[in-house]
Regions:
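Cross-family detector of peptidyl-prolyl cis-trans isomerase
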Residues: 1-220
Length: 220
């Protein structure tokens, strides 16, 4: 058999000066979006001035500069301040989450399962329904209890996301098989069946999450 000719490598154009700046912007953007960086802003409620100071510190480190003050004079007080902020935020956030669950539990349209999942089926969809081992395509929006959207297919061109139901948070594994193709469900997930004590990225630790999910397709 004749040898197959490999496809030509794609031609990558050199970046313009403006695009080079955008490339480094993206490097910084994705660095901060890593979970350990995103949690700084989430847990500490940084003001604009504090964000600016944080960026100044990063800029100095990138340029191999040294602080213009004695770090040892600041570090003990900084650790105390950060600890107090984290504890205060956790207490306030816990109260918000409890109040949200109480509101949901007072809504007779929601049902509750043994795991603590609260759900309301908006549209049941058609049979057959997926199983907990199925791979599905869904449209969805996820919010924290303060109404902030932390993830949504609407921000990605409204293209359905594909994933195996045994590879997502337990709340999804339990809830999505309740609907069929074309179905919609509103689910409220306590932290124990969501992202737990650690949180993830913009999601604070011990967060109750609200999802609206539409099942577009059962892939397999």
């Amino acid at each position: 058999a004749p040898a197959l000719t490999p496809p030509p490598a794609p031609i990558v154009k050199d970046l313009t000066p403006e695009q080079q700046k955008q490339a480094f912007f993206l490097q910084g953007f994705f660095l901060v979006r890593q979970a350990q960086w995103a949690s700084i802003a989430t847990e500490l409620d940084l003001s604009d001035e504090e964000v600016s100071a944080l960026l100044d510190g990063m800029r100095a480190a990138l340029k191999n500069e040294t602080p213009k003050f004695k770090a040892e004079d600041i570090i003990p007080g900084a650790e105390k301040m950060i600890g107090e902020r984290v504890a205060g935020k956790a207490k306030r956030w816990g109260a918000q989450n409890e109040a949200f669950l109480a509101k949901i539990d007072a809504d007779k349209e929601f049902k509750k399962t043994a795991s603590g999942l609260r759900y309301k089926i908006i549209t049941p969809g058609t049979d057959p329904k997926p199983t907990a081992a199925s791979t599905v395509k869904c449209l969805y929006t996820g919010k924290t209890v303060d109404g902030k959207v932390f993830d949504s297919t609407a921000t990605r061109g409204n293209a359905p996301a594909e994933f195996p139901l045994n590879g997502v948070i337990p709340a999804w594994t339990e809830a999505v098989p309740m609907i069929g193709k074309g179905g919609k469900i509103l689910l409220v997930a306590p932290a124990n069946i969501a992202y737990g004590e650690q949180g993830q990225g913009p999601i604070p630790p011990n967060s109750v999450l609200e999802f609206e999910v539409e099942l577009v397709e059962i892939v397999k």
